Amino acid sequence: MNLNFTSPLHPASSQRPTSFFIEDILLHKPKPLREVAPDHFASSLASRVPLLDYGYPLMPTPTLLTPHAHHPLHKGDHHHPYFLTTSGMPVPALFPHPQHAELPGKHCRRRKARTVFSDSQLSGLEKRFEIQRYLSTPERVELATALSLSETQVKTWFQNRRMKHKKQLRKSQDEPKAADGPESPEGSPRAPEGAPADARLSLPAGAFVLTEPEDEVDIGDEGELSSGPHVL
């Protein structure tokens, strides 16, 4: 049985008869792809994008680009895609970088510039500090105007100067104590190092303490053993 069908309306030379045999189906070759130049990418694409037979564009395999020569922190507002097709069509990245990358340490607290006072300003501040340690608001404004400073600068300077003055006083008070050492005040009896602490505290004026080794004991008047220091 022959299953070949031919159309009577068209000549045999213009159209190949359709066959449903397995051999004819396996030997059938697909139609070649049509190339259509895109309109909106005509200026940027170097080559044409091939289209499938049903009209959808055939996208070639994306190729990974090498890293940009410039650091991503210094890039402009334009965005460089990570992938480009072989025809030059950009493909957006899955995880794009933020538009404005933060610099390391951006949120660190910036240190304020240190105020530099002139010699005349320092002299005026020191003279006022010797007279008065604390200033009221009107006094600060008056002094700041006289020295061509701001009220905040005068207030900050007086705070730092008071802290410095307190440290100097504390240091001057600690130096005599370090020079004297652990000696007792003049006029008070000093007990030997081996005497107990309670004996040292309860000594009368002018008393002298004798200390003996711990293995030696004395016999009292009533025949009892007694140890420890004896006060003469």
From Swiss-Prot:
PROSITE patterns: HOMEOBOX_1, HOMEOBOX_2. Keywords: Activator, Cytoplasm, DNA-binding, Homeobox, Nucleus, Transcription, Transcription regulation. One of its GO terms (molecular function) is sequence-specific double-stranded DNA binding. Gene3D superfamilies: Homeodomain-like. Residues 212-224 have a biased composition (Acidic residues). Residues 160-232 are annotated as: Disordered. Residues 161-170 have a biased composition (Basic residues). Expressed in brain. In brain, it is restricted to a few specific developing brain structures such as pineal gland, telencephalic septum, hypothalamic pre-mammillary body and arcuate nucleus. GO terms for biological process: brain development; eating behavior; locomotory behavior; mammary gland involution; positive regulation of transcription by RNA polymerase II. It comes from the Eukaryota. Residues 108-168 bind DNA. Residues 171-180 have a biased composition (Basic and acidic residues). GO terms for cellular component: cytoplasm; nucleus; transcription regulator complex. Belongs to the distal-less homeobox family. DNA binding protein that function as transcriptional activator. Is essential for normal postnatal growth and nursing. Is an essential factor for neuronal neuropeptide Y and agouti-related peptide function and locomotory behavior in the control of energy balance. This is Brain-specific homeobox protein homolog. It comes from Mus musculus.
